[in-house]
Amino acid sequence: MRNDGAALLQHRDDIAGISDPGLWVFPGGHLEWGEAAQDGAVREMEEETCYRCHDLRLLTRLPLEEGELLFFWENYDGRQRLVCREGQGLEFVDREKVESMPRQPYLTAVFDLALAAQRCPPFLRGTETNAPKHDG
């Protein structure tokens, strides 16, 4: 997420046989065998955009028949150059524009969650992957 609330979206290739052909999605992908979800998200983001995440946080989970989608977020640092290495393009998009883009129905709800998380004070942003542990 950029500081102005725009989210980075990837325009998927319009090729039969891939997931979400021709749709706008959050960058992502599949986990490698034995890979932790957060590590996979960092790897996929770097593979698809050349962006190296440093403060990735779990946002939400979406259960599916064949598993689940996990969504992570972090604020874009504004320094690293983004490069589209998969798909037709990358674009920072504001919430209103998303409504008119070809997308999965859940994208707008996840976008809203990311906006809410971004507005939270930092001490409320802990997740299961980086929240302080309590001894009992």
Which residues are covered by each model-predicted region?
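N-terminal strand-loop-strand
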Residues: 1-25, 53
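Short, charged/polar surface micro-motifs in flexible loops or helix N-caps
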Residues: 2-7, 15-16, 32, 66, ...
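A short local loop/turn or secondary-structure capping micro-motif enriched for an aromatic residue
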Residues: 16-19, 42, 80, 91-92
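The catalytic Nudix box helix
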Residues: 26-59
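Active-site-adjacent beta-strand/loop module that shapes the phosphate/pyrophosphate-binding cleft
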Residues: 60-84, 89-97, 108-117
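Charged phosphate-binding loop/patch that engages nucleotide di/tri-phosphates or the phosphate backbone
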Residues: 108-136
